[in-house]
A protein has these predicted regions:
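Signature for the C-terminal beta-barrel architecture of outer-membrane proteins
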Residues: 21, 60, 104-111, 120-121, ...
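Flexible internal linker/loop segments at domain or repeat junctions
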Residues: 283-300
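Positively charged n-region of N-terminal signal peptides that target proteins for export
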Residues: 1-4
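Short glycine/proline- and aromatic-enriched beta-strand/turn motifs that initiate or cap beta-hairpins
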Residues: 20-42, 274-276
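Surface-exposed loop and membrane-interface regions of Gram-negative outer-membrane beta-barrel proteins
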Residues: 33-45, 53-112, 118-128, 243-250, ...
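Outer-membrane beta-barrel "beta-signal"
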Residues: 374-388
Length: 388
């Protein structure tokens, strides 16, 4: 009895020293997509458990374990073509991150992160995913310097999507290793450099860890800041250089994103105009959809407007539209591809229940020979998330 009491007392003492919190998320997502006459249905059921422990004043450990069941149901046309419905179970350690902060002189600090966590480049496009990495973040009054290096080959191919022209993953249940890249990044941000403007530089490398034949170097620059009162801009441009032996159409590529946003200050209303340009040979590390039909980021110019508002505290509404153009092999604007729209409604039903509905559709230019017989592509999504 005395041992049980001492053990219980020790546990209470440990939790008082190391603050501990945990919780979970249950969600279901339904997709209806493809041309209106050939719609397909996908169902995702997901659950995750997370925990956070403060291991002292400046050290934190966080983790997130994820399970998902995905059903891709073949429609009638796909069944006639020989395709069957597929069902995939996914199990993943979404994140495991140890973070420590070291306070230095002159209001400077050094932050160390180790484990598996999300990484984003300036554009949010080139590399926007999880990474098993070591990261250093040095912060001063005049500059922010970031460095990280990591490996993608231990990630779950079912939960990340990376571009590789030759990697074929194993068809293992639950977990299969992803495309193996050795990734490194160094970036410098100069906040409020002049006239409240922010400037940033970054350099990325992605080396093919399998045979070093498909290698990438990315160099990026970013500008952002106020133009006048509530009017702001953001500009990023990333240049890609191909260094491997894998045959390429071109050894150079470019991604440029520009946005001007007006913050009204009323009901969180934001109105923005944006443009995204990708040259013919640009290939990011993370495979990201750029159009409503699921097209990858490749050889496209997209320009449009976007608006969002919170008419009441728990409701978020957004609406956007874009004109899309193909980019030719010489990187000039080639042909008008089509027009797309997107809409989203997100409602916080209760503190722990979130409802999210979205719709998007692209209408192809029927006068363009490349899309003469393509029907409009529709994408509908309904998502319910319960937190506990």
């Amino acid at each position: 009895m005395k041992r049980i009491f001492l053990t219980f007392l020790l546990l209470l003492t440990s939790f008082s020293v190391f603050a501990f919190d945990f919780g979970g998320i249950l969600s279901t997502t339904s997709y209806v997509q493809d041309s209106v006459s050939n719609l397909s249905f996908n169902q995702y059921v997901e659950s995750s458990l997370w925990m956070r422990a403060n291991l002292g004043k400046n050290t934190t450990l966080t983790s997130d374990i994820f399970y998902s069941f995905n059903g891709d149901f073949a429609n009638e046309a796909e069944l006639q073509a020989g395709k069957e419905s597929t069902f995939i179970n996914k199990l993943d350690l979404s994140s495991l991150k140890l973070t420590s902060k070291f306070n230095l002189e002159n209001n400077s600090s050094l932050n160390l992160s180790l484990g598996r966590f999300l990484i984003n480049d300036f554009s949010g496009v080139v590399f926007a995913q999880k990474l098993d990495a070591l990261a250093l973040n040095f912060v001063t009054e005049n500059a922010i310097v970031n460095f990280y290096t990591g490996y993608t080959g231990l990630l779950n191919q079912y939960t990340v999507s990376m571009f590789s022209p030759k990697f074929v993953p194993d068809a293992n249940p639950f977990y299969t290793f992803a495309t193996p890249y050795i990734v490194a990044n160094v970036s410098v941000k100069l906040p409020v450099l002049f006239a409240s403007q922010n400037l940033g530089f970054e350099l990325y490398t992605a080396l093919d860890a399998k045979d070093f034949s498909y290698n990438r170097i990315y160099s990026g620059i970013s500008f952002d800041g106020p133009i006048y009162k509530s009017l702001y801009y953001a500009l990023t441009s990333t240049f890609q250089f191909n260094l491997g032996t894998y045959p390429e159409k071109s050894n150079f590529g470019n991604l440029t994103k520009a946005e001007i946003s007006w913050f009204s200050g009323v009901k969180s209303f934001i109105l923005s105009a944006n443009a995204t340009y990708l040259s013919d040979s640009f290939t990011p590390i993370t495979s990201t959809d750029v159009l409503s039909d699921g097209s990858d980021l490749d050889s496209v110019l997209k320009t449009g407007i976007f608006a969002s508002v919170k008419p009441i505290d728990k409701l978020f509404v957004s609406l956007g539209s874009d004109f899309v153009f193909d980019v030719a092999e010489n990187n000039s604007i080639q042909d008008y591809k089509g027009f797309q729209y997107s809409a989203q409604l997100r409602y916080q039903l209760f503190d722990d229940v979130l409802l999210n509905f979205s719709a998007s559709q692209i209408f192809y230019n029927q006068q363009n020979p490349a899309y003469q017989n393509q029907e409009p592509y529709l994408n509908l999504k309904a998502h319910i998330r319960i937190s506990f």
